[in-house]
Swiss-Prot record:
The gene is pnp. Its main location: cytoplasm. Keywords: Cytoplasm, Magnesium, Metal-binding, Nucleotidyltransferase, RNA-binding, Transferase. Mg(2+) binds at residues 493, 499. This is Polyribonucleotide nucleotidyltransferase. GO terms for biological process: mRNA catabolic process; RNA processing. It comes from Akkermansia muciniphila (strain ATCC BAA-835 / DSM 22959 / JCM 33894 / BCRC 81048 / CCUG 64013 / CIP 107961 / Muc). It comes from the Bacteria.
């Protein structure tokens, strides 16, 4: 057994990458460790291409084992179940920087698996998964362009922190995951608390410096134990078929791909493709559908890129930095929906519905790694097939929908008010009505407006915009020229080189995600894209503010909530024996009450009257009975020597028979009965805390007040 390892001294804790000890039958396998968090990452690629394979079948799996945190899995079977949202997001985060590093046309089935073996609760395994996936490919015999490194950047007290621990992240204003090569960026994602663009760019530069260290260490590992690269074949368009394709479509493809609408464009492109297919199969009957598809896609992509680079011409006729027509509208649904909004950008449209609920509706998550295990703001993204004029599977969420929802959620979350200011659980559901690029950014805009329409006091509105990229490269795959595109449509995403999504307020950045089809771009290009996005975001915010600029009144159908605080050591008094007191308050007011361990009491009611009554009853329970004050309450029992009244919830006082009325009272029941509501004055509290009340004294005070008001003096 030959074991080799390298140590990357970056961030809070060094990252160790080791190979040769575990999973030695995989094409590549490494164990990555930071602190006491350990992951195993493997890669295996098939040696033959499956018949009919038309794309690069790269699958990335990430699994958190309960044993890694010294825990038992929940559920009846006590086994890990289907992937959690966090696992799916980590899969996507690991996949995106790897995919561009394989050669174009490499269609061999390839699988990367990351297993969390140990979790110390402080060092997040997602960064280890990305670094491990790259290292496993680097030491394997797979055709992998060059090492990819990844770091997380936080910003605490104005200082950038590399790979902050979970404890440090709680105080960070930035959560940036950066993946790249030694000198180029491939992928970023994360969130920030309205970070100015200049500071955001500074964070990217710091990340690039540290990623370089990790990439160099992977190269060291490859030098001592890397396998010789395997032989493989690439599935590319055949020259003889390309010649036929250009003969048929070369002069007509531009007219087809630059039709004004998506539907018309699809019709023209489809008709031209059929002509190309017929011509190819007539001359080469052995040609497959895939051969035809490769030829036609090559011609389309080439025409698209030439038009952008040489003519500054976009498919829908816009200038390179021009937005599509914008539409913003709130309250598009009846007020039974707490808040609704619709945002459209060209042929992309999102309808968002905001719902408010008691805090007990917040989402709780199984968490083995020590990161967030609950959240009160949730955004769900739904992409039905009709949004692209298609049929297909409906219901349930795929990885793409989960990823888009997470991006929109973390982009809006920084402006959502805290629990103390707005004690609600909040859910936004984004329903994509039409899709032609950047539906996640439309979800951010519509989601923001729906929250304002629901009365949520956001710090500031958030808007999102996408920036695309088209490049020209030399034989060494170096970028020689490029054009950035604002607000890209679907075809520009498909045929372009970049989809960079940036969200923020008028004050700064809140969320971002970069996806590339290239094996990296210089930071300077990304910095330019950030400034382009900022200008576009400003224009989008203007349109949104015209629709709604401030929180509206809450819907009458939204729950009413009040929060109060009681001493933590007196929670039992509010609950009462067997829940007697709290049940009585809820029954009388119609409200729901939730008590936290620190004594915070959340009161929820459908109507304001019930909320006010419940708050009054809770407040009264923790008031101190004072001598000389008047109190109104029910008679709870009678005796031969008097009656007991409920002075405050859970606190009774005795009205002696002599204090029930003026003159002599023969029998208590002659004056009061159980259930009567009376007003009495506290006339004393003995050393044992027993309260003495008097109806007679209350009546005397009332008569004296009436006489004084009438100007009568004795």
């Amino acid at each position: 057994m030959s074991i080799h390892s390298v140590e990357c001294n970056v961030g809070t804790n060094p990252i160790t990458i080791e190979t040769g000890k575990m999973a030695r039958l995989a094409d590549g396998a490494v164990v990555v460790r930071s602190g006491d968090t350990v992951v195993l990452v493997t890669v295996v690629s098939a040696t033959k291409v499956k018949e009919g394979q038309t794309f690069f079948p790269l699958s990335v799996e990430y699994k958190e084992k309960a044993a890694a945190a010294g825990m038992f899995p929940g559920g009846y079977f006590k086994r890990e179940g289907r992937p959690t949202e966090k696992e799916i997001l980590t899969c996507r985060m690991t996949d995106r920087p790897l995919r561009p590093m394989f050669p174009k046309g490499y269609f061999y089935d390839t699988q990367v698996i990351t297993l969390l073996l140990s979790a110390d609760g402080e060092n997040e395994p997602d960064i280890l998964s990305i670094n491990g996936a790259s290292a496993a490919c680097v030491v394997s015999d797979l055709p992998f362009a060059e090492p990819v490194g990844a770091v997380r950047v936080g910003r605490i007290d104005g200082q950038f922190v590399i790979n902050p621990t979970n404890s440090q992240r709680e105080h960070s204003q930035l959560d940036l995951v950066f993946a790249g090569t030694k000198d180029q960026v491939i992928m970023i994602e994360g969130s920030a608390n309205e970070l100015p663009e200049e500071d955001f760019i500074a964070a990217l530069r710091v990340a690039q410096e540290n990623v370089k260290v990790i990439c160099e260490k992977q190269e060291e590992l490859r030098a001592v134990c890397g396998k010789e690269k395997r032989a493989y074949e690439l599935c590319l368009a055949k020259p003889e078929l390309l010649e036929i394709g250009y003969e048929i479509a070369g002069d007509r493809i531009e007219e087809a791909i630059y039709a004004p609408s998506k539907v018309e464009r699809q019709k023209k492109v489809g008709a031209l493709r059929d002509e190309v297919e017929a011509a190819i199969k007539e001359r080469h009957p052995e040609a497959t559908d895939f051969d035809v598809e490769q030829v036609f896609e090559y011609i389309q992509k080439k025409a698209f890129r030439i038009s952008i680079m040489e003519k500054d011409k976009r498919a829908d006729g816009r200038a390179l930095k021009q937005l599509r027509p914008l539409t913003a509208e709130v309250n598009v649904l009846p007020p039974v929906v707490h808040g609704s909004a619709m945002f459209a950008r060209g042929e992309t449209m999102s309808l968002c519905l905001a719902t408010l609920a008691p805090m007990e509706e917040r989402q709780y998550m199984d968490n083995y790694t020590g990161s967030v295990n609950e959240k009160r703001f949730i955004l769900h993204y739904n992409f039905p097939p009709f949004s692209v004029g298609d049929t297909g599977r409906f219901g349930g969420q795929n990885r793409r929908e989960i990823g888009h929802g997470a991006l929109a959620e973390r982009s809006i979350a920084p402006v959502v008010p805290g629990e103390q200011e707005f004690p609600y659980a909040i859910r936004v559901s984004s329903e994509i009505m039409e899709s032609n690029g950047s539906t996640s950014m439309a979800s951010v805009c519509a989601g923001t407006m729906s929250l304002l329409a629901a009365g949520v006091p956001l710090k500031r509105p958030v808007a999102g915009i996408s920036v695309g990229l088209v490049t020209e490269q030399n034989d060494q795959h170096e970028i020689t020229s490029y054009k950035t595109l604002l607000d890209i449509i679907g075809s520009e995403d498909f045929y372009g080189d970049m989809d960079f999504k940036l969200c923020g307020t008028s004050e700064g950045v809140t969320g971002y995600q970069l996806d590339l089809k290239l094996p990296g771009i210089p930071l300077s290009i990304l910095e330019e894209a950030i400034h382009v996005a900022k200008a576009g975001r400003t224009d989008v915010l203007k349109v949104m503010n015209e629709a709604i600029a401030a929180p509206a009144q809450m819907s009458p159908n939204a729950p009413r909530i009040e929060t109060t605080k009681i001493p933590a050591d007196r929670i039992g008094e509010l609950i009462g024996p067997g829940g007697k007191n709290i049940k009585a308050i809820q029954a009388e007011s119609g409200a729901d009450i939730n008590i936290e361990e620190d004594g915070t009491v959340h009161i929820y009611a459908a109507k304001q009257e019930g909320l006010d009554r419940a708050l009054e009853l809770v407040t009264r329970m923790f008031k101190t009975i004072e001598i000389g004050e008047l109190y109104t309450g029910k008679i709870v029992s009678t005796t031969t020597f008097g009656a007991f009244m409920e002075v405050l919830p859970g606190k009774d006082g005795l009205i002696h028979i002599s204090e029930l009325a003026e003159g002599r009272t023969a029998k208590t029941e002659d004056v009061v009965s159980v259930g009567d509501v009376v007003t009495a004055k506290c006339i004393g509290i003995d050393d044992k805390g027993r309260v003495k009340m008097s109806i007679r004294a209350a009546l005397r005070d009332a008569k004296a007040a009436e006489a004084e008001a009438a100007g009568i003096t004795e």
